[in-house]
Amino acid sequence: SKAAEMSASFRRQSGVRRLIEFLTIHRLPPELAVRLYRIYGPDAQDALRDDPYLLVDPYYGADFAAVDAFALELELPADDERRVEAGVLFELSFNLNHGHTFIPAEKLCAATAALLSLEPEIIRAGMTRLSEQGRMVVDRVAGLEACYLPQFYEAEEYVCRRILQMTGELEAPSNLESLVDRAEQSQSLTYAAQQREAIRMAAQRQLLIVTGGPGTGKTTVMSGILALYDQMKVKTLLAAPTGRAAKRLAECTGREASTIHRLLESQFDEETGMMSFFHDEDEPLPCDALIVDETSMVDLQLMTALLRALKPKCRLILVGDPDQLPSVGAGNLFADLIRSGRVET
């Protein structure tokens, strides 16, 4: 009934208001109140007293120092397991915000020990617990014990697996040379030997990297690939990481281009604080080929979403300059792919 709805709304507003007062008294961001109430309802204050470090979760994104001060006000011991584990996860997340997908175990232990002013043995015990609980993944990378947040470990594994699946050759049209000639004529220019080879490769490979600095002819190659794919009846979409890059891509190719987020139809879930995408394995992109420009700016999470949205046989052309702006998020993917030597470049 309407009366019941009004009563529930009043209780919710009163609860949020009390929570705002509680957070303000303890010098915590009052804007966290709505999210906390959404999860814990009227028990939110009890939940915070029980484990103040739940606020360090990315869903809340509270400052670690403020949460730590609040926890110590509640007289939680400095070596409390919840504090140690939260400190380790905070350092891992901090590392991600600086572009790294993992942190060596020794470095993570030292950084957390300094953050919490605790002995390394206590931190190592916390790291072991997190690993046993599945809240942190430890793997050997280049002889190091590497520590990951689970979602980044899984993303890295998926991208490696998918890239390897895409490195095989495709059957090229028997009249490929004449198709490339026609593409060249349609652009009214003469391809340099390397440009011609790159355009030919776009017919022979499922995955191709087109790289080079400014003025090296990447735009000519992209336009040539588009002209070739038109003749091969390969439906092609174009995307770039930012609005500005997508606009530039559209202008230089004369085709429609969009941001990767828009192409994948990104949706932000208020409940979880997570980004999701409409296009994935179950709803793949309606194309036979995708050309991505400014790939150096694509981070690990976005590349994972992009690869999930491609049909199994969809071609992928990654274009960019590894010396240009790196991705804001974790993972220097484009440069790593070039360095690996596993992808045709």
Model-derived features: positions:
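Conserved ATP-binding/catalytic motifs of P-loop helicase motor domains
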Residues: S1-T345
